[in-house]
Amino acid sequence: LNEKDIAADAAQACKEIEQGKLLVDSGRSLIEAGLQKTRSLAEEYVLRAKALMTDYAEPRRFELACHAYEQGIELTRANLSEEELAKSLFEYGCFLQTNKRYDLAEVRYRENLDICQRLAAISPYAYEPDLATTQNNLGLLYSDTQCYGESEEMYLSAVEIYQRLSVVDPRVYDPDLARTRNNLGNLYRDTQRYGESEEMYLSAVEIFREL
């Protein structure tokens, strides 16, 4: 090849690169638009679920609301991030727990817990608060279903996380630490471990007084 041919090929290569960049940019825009649409649709499923629960004339309102939540979760699972999936699972778990469907709530919380543990291993400060919140809710769930050993395990794990976080930002995390210790105090009281119950209550009261 002579110099002229090389220059022509180089110009063509540059042109192809620029065309490729345009396609990539266009593709990114389409992907981002699709993700935003998916987020909106997932949120619409949640809003539908909440609206269904206010329709007291509908005998199947709970079943229909669950279906709407599950549709939103599967849409999120297929298209969005693990972080967004974890949030959807947590919200559905709270809904089920509030409606005393503890078996179903446990399944969703446990899946959320697995995701939060993976994310927290990579970025503790970003995801440990969500992990502790799920553990606290599971502690409440297990306490309500008389699974006291599992409840204590979850509460203690949450307390450990909140203690670390409160050292960094007490204003934000001291209330969570106090509430979880109070929940642990309730658990020890219900299982007649009164000395440990008193210890947890007193530590919670001390934190609340300082808020």
What are these regions (language model features)?
Residues A7-A10, G20, E58, F62, ...:
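TPR-repeat structural position
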Residues V46-T54, E83-T98, P129-D144, P175-D190:
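Conserved alpha-helical positions within TPR/SEL1-like repeat arrays
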Residues Q36-E43, E63, L80-E83, I122, ...:
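Residue signature of alpha-solenoid helical repeat architecture, marking inter-repeat boundaries
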Residues R118, P124-Y125, P129-A132, R164, ...:
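Conserved positions within tandem-repeat grammars
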Residues L1-L41, D55-E58:
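Long, domain-scale regions corresponding to catalytic signaling modules most often appended to membrane systems
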Residues K21-G27, I31-G34, T38, L52, ...:
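Alpha-helical junction/boundary sensor with strong preference for TPR arrays
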